[in-house]
């Protein structure tokens, strides 16, 4: 399968992109927006198989992480920059008509783009384990924390209240929380793209979102689009896991308000159903894309 890699100049830096497969008439490319901010494209390589059906799959490292790593420029890490980067990448690669999949932060970006920019040429959106409200996300994560041991609850909430995230108790509790709702430990049996070392954008995450999933304090903390979801007119597939950071309540909040939407709940998944239920996810996604070309 053909894989093309390259860089696009952006704001004096460079944005890395990776294109899998070749264009086939009648099948619009699938563009992938990774999470974080700062998580890199790597985990999306488990979706390369989609290109075998003749559909080009395009992923990239957003500025601040991976092969587009930048640090010491906190002024970059906001929605305007990341959406401008997407707009420029579409121009650079001639992506007039696409399907757009955003996972976690990438889904926030897709919603923001859809509602505030009203872009042309989007055949469908796939909102994967994402959110329409930072406040609701915070509330749901804190609800989840209430089910943890009293020791872990105290460690997590003390850190939030004091602003001191350095204690061993906090970091151990955070690790348990993320393993429960985000992803398990990477092992020798994990896909190669997950085992590969990556340059995460920790500054992008902290400046953009905050110190952890339940403390949105960064440039994205005012993200609130629930009451405007009805403005998304394109077909929209919401996907989430049963024990996802994107709780079923968060997913249903989006599904209920987007007019032309479908929701697929993955029973055995946390925050990355495309990894934990890979075959099913690819089947569901491929059927969706084929139906909405």
Swiss-Prot record:
Active site residues per record: 104, 244, 271
InterPro entries: AB_hydrolase_1, AB_hydrolase_fold, AB_hydrolase_sf, Peptidase_S33, Pro_imino_pep
Any GO BP annotation: proteolysis
Enzyme class: hydrolase
EC number in record: 3.4.11.5
Functional description taken from the UniProt entry: Releases the N-terminal proline from various substrates.
Protein name: Proline iminopeptidase
Species the sequence originates in: Clostridioides difficile (strain 630) (Peptoclostridium difficile)
Organism classification: Bacteria, Bacillati, Bacillota, Clostridia, Peptostreptococcales
Underlying gene: pip
